[in-house]
Amino acid sequence: MACIYPTTFYTSLPTKSLNMGISLTTILILSVAVLLSTAAPPSCRECYQSLHYRGEMQQYFTYHTHIERSCYGNLIEECVESGKSYYKVKNLGVCGSRNGAICPRGKQWLCFTKIGQWGVNTQVLEDIKREQIIAKAKASKPTTPPENRPRHFHSFIQKL
């Protein structure tokens, strides 16, 4: 990404452009706006749905864990919502099906998680992560030798 510094910016403008009525402030503001717009991650605003709840209209972000490949084309965009990355695609099966695949009905745009799309169930991943945490906790637990306890109460009485 190119950086534009005001000192370089002012000296690099030809004097002819100053006479055409374009102010340096306008050019600087437009340049900064272009730089900021390219740096910001795209939002997932197309994946919000309106819902009436208790007499109020509310917006909810909806995403899917898996969408059939034939429901969307080759144009896959990344978007960010609440710090998490999603894929955003145009729904080619708005009526509910396309090429035999069942597609989400009535939505023009679809967002889906990256990991669920490629055939990995998110519940399986959560279980694997949980097992890893438990295994790590067991490994870090200090091992103490077992105490000499009798296995049965009657063997304890016999020793006395």
Swiss-Prot record:
It comes from Homo sapiens (Human). Interacts (secreted) with SLC1A5; mainly at cell surface. The lineage of its organism: Eukaryota, Metazoa, Chordata, Craniata, Vertebrata. Coiled coil: none annotated. Residues 137-160 are annotated as: Disordered. The keyword Glycoprotein does not apply. Specifically expressed in placenta by extravillous trophoblasts and syncytiotrophoblasts (at protein level). Keywords: ERV, Secreted, Signal, Transposable element. The gene is ERVH48-1. It comes from the Eukaryota. GO terms for biological process: syncytium formation. May play a role in trophoblasts syncytialization, the spontaneous fusion of their plasma membranes, an essential process in placental development. May negatively regulate cell-cell fusion by interacting with SLC1A5, the probable receptor on the cell surface of the fusogenic syncytin-1/ERVW-1. GO terms for cellular component: extracellular space. It is found in: Secreted. Residues 1-39 form the signal peptide. The human genome contains a high percentage of proviral-like elements, also called endogenous retroviruses (ERVs) that are the genomic traces of ancient infections of the germline by exogenous retroviruses. Although most of these elements are defective, some have conserved a functional envelope (env) gene, most probably diverted by the host for its benefit. The keyword 4Fe-4S does not apply. This is Suppressyn.
